[in-house]
């Protein structure tokens, strides 16, 4: 018995691939099964006839099996005779497939008898009961094999199904041995003509019973499903023994045939879906639709939120502040603000629709995310903060208006001062050749060595009767040194004499001579005025210099009036009084001169009209002189003119700055005067 067990155990190990691959065998498998049946029939042909005659009344399903045997015998008779001459070892090996089905039939019976799934054919040395059971099992085995083969011919992709899932077997053999069982559930075809006795090849030697040692032997585990090529080669690899399998797991595994069928179906389905999924780049159509729609909804929500924030910020900014605020740009492409799609979606991204579907709930204004790729110059203000901050600004309306008016006023004043500064600092108009020669004649009066030094300046001051200290003389020379080289040359002298600011300071100082000390800053203008009054310069030089300064005074007066108008408008709008010191600081020299003149005209005009001091002062720059009279009396009245031209005091009536030129000695008033001074001829007669 031990011998028999040792021989059958390797075959049991090699039987598992046959059981797993028997469900999907092709025509090759069908031929192999027929060869195994023929070989088995040759070994027990003599005993088959006797057993059939004895078992026919005893077998419960005997008449039901005869048509199958007859059909199988007819099929076997059509096989070529060369198949019987094949090696017996292969026939024994291929015979294991049909016999394993017989094992499932025997185990499903309630008698509890177990038949070995595999074993070598034994001679007819068994009892009658064993022969009956073997005969009935053999008949069922042949029928089930033929039905499976018939189905395989019609549909190779559908293996024979098992009844173990619908009818679980609760036998001791399943719990002890754990062997896979299978029961074929194919419908029985209609019986055909013929008897079981007519089949000479139906007899198969009986199989030995399973002993207690065989029950305790480890079961054969199912193998991994193989490809069609492996299934074709499985027949020849059955005879080779395999290493002992590991110990079985406690729960009984499902039948290997069912598991192989499920795995094959799953594998085929996955292989068919794999190209489509690889092309789409997703795990399934459901995930694709969910991911794509989610991305579209997120993009639409982000765009809608950004658009609402932009409109709201623009409206609030326009309402609360008059200043222009740079808004968030929304004219960029839509794809710039679209976040990237998930990595599982490799299809090209499409632009989001401009309108939001009706079934999409719009997000809250303050909770919508802002896209990170959107470039913006101004951060959008949250709407929730603006809603409750707006009423707080209402009581502060008056203060805001005052602050705004003050800011606007300061900006206008700054603009006016900037205009005046630019007018002062602009490049002086280029002097003509005649004008330059006229200033050259004035420069030569100092008789210096090509420059004005302290010695020559003191001599001129003594000639005209001015008294200056040496410190004041040095200060005057330093102020005249424009380039700072320590020498007052002709270039520096021209810069001083054409300086507009110095000129208007000199005019103001002449008006207020009685109350202002000598100014070294305007000393050269004072000397020029006296020299023109003394007619110490050539006639051409006097005319050019007078015309030049009259033009400068006219431009300055018009500019002062414009400044006065602008400042008056600002003062009326702001209605904020200035102190006297602020007024003095804000006024320009031209405006200050006009203000002083108007104030002096208003004070005691009638009383001071007959005063000798009401005479127009002897200020030079008057070209309308009688040339013959000047030449005739220049030598005799030189010293007296110098003494008379030294101003000691000035009367309040100084309106002679704008007198209309007429007869000699005329004192008529005119606001559109073309000449600065016109009363010098009255003194020369």
From Swiss-Prot:
Binding site for Ca(2+): 481, 483, 485, 487, 492
Positions with biased composition (Pro residues): 241-255
CDD domains: EFh
Domain of life where this protein originates: Eukaryota
Record InterPro entries: EF-hand-dom_pair, EF_Hand_1_Ca_BS, EF_hand_dom, SPT21
Manganese keyword on record: no
Region (Disordered): 1-289, 302-385, 656-685
Entry keyword set: Calcium, Metal-binding
EF-hand domain sequence ranges: 468-503
Biased composition (Polar residues): 70-108, 323-338, 374-385
Biased composition (Low complexity): 18-27
Tissue: Expressed in testis. Exclusively expressed in haploid spermatids and very weakly in spermatogonia, spermatocytes, and Sertoli cells as well as in interstitial cell.
Biased composition, class Basic and acidic residues, residue ranges: 1-14, 256-266, 666-675
Record GO terms (molecular function): calcium ion binding
UniProt function note: Involved in the differentiation of haploid spermatids.
Protein name: Spermatogenesis-associated protein 21
Organism this protein belongs to: Rattus norvegicus
């Amino acid at each position: 018995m031990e011998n028999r067990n040792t021989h059958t155990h390797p075959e049991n190990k090699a039987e598992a691939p046959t059981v797993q691959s028997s469900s999907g065998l092709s025509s090759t498998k069908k031929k192999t099964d027929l060869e195994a049946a023929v070989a088995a029939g040759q070994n027990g042909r003599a005993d088959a006839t006797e057993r059939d005659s004895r078992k026919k009344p005893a077998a419960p399903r005997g008449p039901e099996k005869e048509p199958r045997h007859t059909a199988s015998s007819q099929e076997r008779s059509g096989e070529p005779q060369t198949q019987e001459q094949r090696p017996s070892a292969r026939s024994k090996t291929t015979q294991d497939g049909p016999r394993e089905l017989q094992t499932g039939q025997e185990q499903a019976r309630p008698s509890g008898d177990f038949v070995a799934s595999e074993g070598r054919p034994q001679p007819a040395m068994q009892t009658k009961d064993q022969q009956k059971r073997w005969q009935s099992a053999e008949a069922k085995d042949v029928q089930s094999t033929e039905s499976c083969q018939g189905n395989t011919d019609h549909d190779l992709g559908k293996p024979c199904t098992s009844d173990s899932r619908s009818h679980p077997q609760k036998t001791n053999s399943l719990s002890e041995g754990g062997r896979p069982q299978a029961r074929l559930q194919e419908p029985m075809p209609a019986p055909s003509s013929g008897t079981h006795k007519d089949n000479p090849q139906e007899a198969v030697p009986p199989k030995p019973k399973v002993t207690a040692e065989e029950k305790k032997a480890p079961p054969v585990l199912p193998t991994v499903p193989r490809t069609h090529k492996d299934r074709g080669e499985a027949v020849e690899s059955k005879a080779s023994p395999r290493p002992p399998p590991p110990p079985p797991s406690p729960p009984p595994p499902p039948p290997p045939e069912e598991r192989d069928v499920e795995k094959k179906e799953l594998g085929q389905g996955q292989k068919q879906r794999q190209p489509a999924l690889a092309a789409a780049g997703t795990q399934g159509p459901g995930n694709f639709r969910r991911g794509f729609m989610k991305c579209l909804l997120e993009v639409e929500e982000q765009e809608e939120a950004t658009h609402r924030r932009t409109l709201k910020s623009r409206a609030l900014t326009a309402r609360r502040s008059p200043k222009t605020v740079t808004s968030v740009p929304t004219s960029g492409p839509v794809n710039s603000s679209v976040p990237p799609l998930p990595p599982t979606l490799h299809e090209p991204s499409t632009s989001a629709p401009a309108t939001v579907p009706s079934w999409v709930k719009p997000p809250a204004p303050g909770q919508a995310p802002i896209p990170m790729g959107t470039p913006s110059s101004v951060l959008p203000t949250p709407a929730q903060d603006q809603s409750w901050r707006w009423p707080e600004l209402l009581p502060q309306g008056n203060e805001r208006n005052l602050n705004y008016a003050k800011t606007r006023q300061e900006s206008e004043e700054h603009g006016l001062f900037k205009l005046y500064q630019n007018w002062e600092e602009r490049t002086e108009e280029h002097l003509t050749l005649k004008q330059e020669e006229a200033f050259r004649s004035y420069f030569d009066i100092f008789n210096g060595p090509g420059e004005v030094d302290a010695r020559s300046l003191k001599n001129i001051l003594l000639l005209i009767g001015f008294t200056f200290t040496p410190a004041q003389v040095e200060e005057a020379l330093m102020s005249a040194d424009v380039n700072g080289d320590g020498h007052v040359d002709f270039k520096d002298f021209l810069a001083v004499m054409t300086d507009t600011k110095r000129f208007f300071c000199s005019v103001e100082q002449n008006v207020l001579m009685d109350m202002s000390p000598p100014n070294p800053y305007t000393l050269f203008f004072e000397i020029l005025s006296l020299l023109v009054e003394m007619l110490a310069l050539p006639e051409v030089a006097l005319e050019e210099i007078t015309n030049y300064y009259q033009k400068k005074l006219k431009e300055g007066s018009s500019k002062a009036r414009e400044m006065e108008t602008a400042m008056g408008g600002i003062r009326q709008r702001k209605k904020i009084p200035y102190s006297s010191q602020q007024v003095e600081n804000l006024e320009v020299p031209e405006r200050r001169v006009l203000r002083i003149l108007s104030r002096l005209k208003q004070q005691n005009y009638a009383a001071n009209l007959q005063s000798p001091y009401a005479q127009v002062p002897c200020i030079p720059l008057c070209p309308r002189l009688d040339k013959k009279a000047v030449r005739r009396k220049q030598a005799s009245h030189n010293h007296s003119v110098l003494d008379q031209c030294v101003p000691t005091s000035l009367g309040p009536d100084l309106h002679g700055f704008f007198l209309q030129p007429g007869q000699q000695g005329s004192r008529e008033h005119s606001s559109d005067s073309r000449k600065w001074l016109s009363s010098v001829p009255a003194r020369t007669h």
